[in-house]
């Protein structure tokens, strides 16, 4: 998935099963001798000798209540006693990935928490996994806090882009290693399985214990393979095993998966986990859509070179209730759908799995999207904002990650490597717009039968306003703004100056969708780094007019996103 984040229509969210966001003593890079020799000091850490941190200003403090609480629960009555015991082990393993993500995103958590004097400060820092506001351009929240490093904790604080580009090390762009300085100041790689050896060993043990309790033999095999993968950083065998699973009622996503946290290059993956319960009845309703992927790939509005033969036929769609988020998936905006694995080789051979997170999705629709639509969608079109359209738009965003092109036409790199730090935003933008393209085509074929096409377009526009509130700093935020401004330039929607509400212009909206699909796929296929960078710099921004409209949502006290009450106690385990 790329984490749709939980953004655009996901968050989002979005995510490698090659490794799609609780607390314990954090001591980054202290797990092994090899690690301690190469570790650099944590970036932007708090000096324990300084006075307590205060809110940077009133505006920062006012944002402490932008998240609405939501209890993560699910019907576990069909699970055996063994499976319920297994769930507890999976949640315990997920909690450790939460610790790992703190190390990757910020550094020593306890040092920060000890300098925050109020529960409100600590809670908000916890939601952001650090002292920066993830849904407001990563702005500092507290006094004495500098700008968030683009490379988080993946790179040395003093490393420049130029220094990295000149670095002659194999796999320097790899997903599963840290860049550190050795004793002589030279850059070197430290694999995750060495850097985080202690925590990963514990996770591996927990997964092996859980496998012994699994009723489904394929799930048991996956847990064992994933346990091994975490200790070697070789995730492909477990990815294949994950794709082979079809009947398991319990699902787990765990490991270093998405690269959004690395805003310097977009190379390095961050740890996260999801523990999920499959909704078998809803999943059955979704089965048929996967079979249309090859046909939809052929119909993409670009020349054949930009739409190579469809990836593997093993792709599937399923609906789930999430019972636990941890690490990257729990930071800031919450993902509502996932598309995994990210490994292109696995995708080509077996396709991907699209996980629709039904309970989280319904929470965002009821608590956030409907109130937003009531403020910003014209009264005449408000009737078109529907949950089935929100569900479909979100679902096909994830499906659309599998469409398009993975490697540049020149054949010398992947799209991700060619577009560098712009790759994630373009991938999310592609998934958003191709998802809507798929909705349009399937509706025309009569395969989507609920409502009318205007429902999906109007709900899509309302969803942009929801996701834009996540800010324009994340990959999803930039993708949202690029699309909003592209559509605005083409009069795909109109703004009523008298009341500040928006209306979809149906035909122009559909035309803009087709043109943007073509343009994004072309930039990806060409590996055009400069154009991608230019687009995001000029179109991936929130202008003053839109900002004024979004301020109406703040005045109406509409939550920006949700946070979860979760864990074994909530589940009654």
Where are these regions (language model features)?
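Bacterial signal peptide processing site
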Residues: 21-24
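Active-site recognition of the HExxH zinc-binding catalytic motif
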Residues: 80, 392-406, 431, 436
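An active-site-proximal "capping" alpha-helix that borders the catalytic cofactor pocket
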Residues: 216, 424-441
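Post-HEXXH active-site segment of zinc metalloproteases
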Residues: 405-429
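Long, well-structured alpha-helical subdomains associated
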Residues: 436-534
């Amino acid at each position: 998935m790329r984490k749709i984040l939980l953004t655009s229509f996901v968050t989002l969210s979005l995510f490698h099963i090659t490794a799609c966001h609780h607390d314990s003593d954090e001591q980054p890079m202290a797990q092994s001798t090899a690690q301690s020799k190469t570790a650099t000091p944590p970036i932007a850490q708090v000096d324990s000798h300084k006075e307590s941190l205060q809110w940077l200003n009133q505006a920062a403090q006012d944002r402490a209540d932008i998240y609405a609480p939501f209890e993560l629960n699910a019907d576990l009555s069909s699970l055996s006693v063994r499976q319920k015991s297994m769930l507890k082990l999976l949640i315990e393993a997920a909690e450790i990935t939460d610790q790992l993500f703190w190390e990757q995103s910020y550094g020593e958590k306890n040092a920060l928490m000890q300098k925050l004097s109020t529960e409100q400060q600590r809670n908000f820092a916890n939601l952001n996994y650090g002292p920066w506001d993830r849904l407001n351009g990563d702005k500092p929240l507290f006094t004495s806090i500098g700008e968030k490093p683009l490379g988080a904790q993946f790179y040395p604080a003093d490393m420049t882009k130029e220094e990295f580009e000149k670095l002659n090390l194999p796999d320097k762009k790899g997903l599963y290693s840290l860049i550190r300085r050795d004793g002589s100041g030279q850059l070197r790689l430290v694999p995750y399985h060495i850097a985080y050896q202690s925590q990963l060993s514990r996770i591996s043990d927990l997964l092996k214990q859980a496998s012994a309790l699994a009723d489904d033999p394929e799930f048991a095999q996956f847990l064992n393979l994933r346990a091994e993968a975490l200790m070697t950083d070789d995730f492909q065998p477990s990815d294949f095993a994950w794709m082979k699973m079809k009947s398991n009622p319990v699902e787990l996503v765990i490991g270093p998966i998405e690269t959004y946290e690395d805003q310097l290059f977009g190379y390095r993956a961050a740890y996260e986990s999801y523990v999920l319960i499959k909704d078998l009845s809803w999943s059955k309703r979704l089965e048929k859509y996967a079979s249309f992927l090859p046909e939809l790939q052929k119909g993409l509005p670009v020349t054949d070179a930009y739409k190579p033969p469809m990836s593997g036929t093993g792709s599937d769609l399923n609906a789930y209730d999430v019972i636990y988020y941890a690490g990257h998936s729990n930071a800031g905006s919450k993902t509502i759908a996932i598309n995994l694995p990210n490994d292109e080789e696995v995708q080509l051979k077996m396709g991907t799995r699209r996980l629709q997170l039904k309970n989280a999705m319904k929470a965002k629709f009821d608590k956030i999207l409907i109130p937003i639509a009531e403020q910003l969608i014209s009264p005449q079109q408000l009737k078109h904002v529907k949950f089935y359209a929100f569900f479909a738009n979100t679902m096909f965003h994830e499906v659309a990650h599998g469409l398009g092109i993975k490697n540049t036409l020149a054949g010398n790199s992947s799209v991700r490597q060619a577009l560098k730090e712009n790759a994630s935003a373009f991938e999310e933008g592609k998934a958003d717009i191709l998802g809507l393209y798929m909705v349009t085509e399937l509706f025309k074929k009569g395969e989507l039968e609920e409502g009318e096409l205007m429902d999906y377009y109007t709900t899509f526009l309302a969803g942009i306003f929801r996701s834009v509130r996540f800010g324009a700093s994340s990959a999803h935020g930039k993708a949202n703004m690029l699309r909003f401004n592209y559509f605005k330039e083409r009069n795909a929607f109109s703004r009523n100056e008298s009341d500040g509400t928006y209306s979809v212009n149906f035909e122009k909206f559909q035309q803009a969708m087709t043109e943007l699909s073509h343009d994004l796929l072309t930039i990806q296929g060409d590996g055009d780094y400069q154009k991608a960078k230019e687009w995001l710099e000029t179109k991936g921004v929130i202008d003053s007019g839109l900002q004024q409209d979004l301020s109406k949502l703040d005045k109406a006290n509409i939550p920006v996103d949700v946070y979860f009450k979760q864990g074994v106690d909530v589940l009654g385990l």
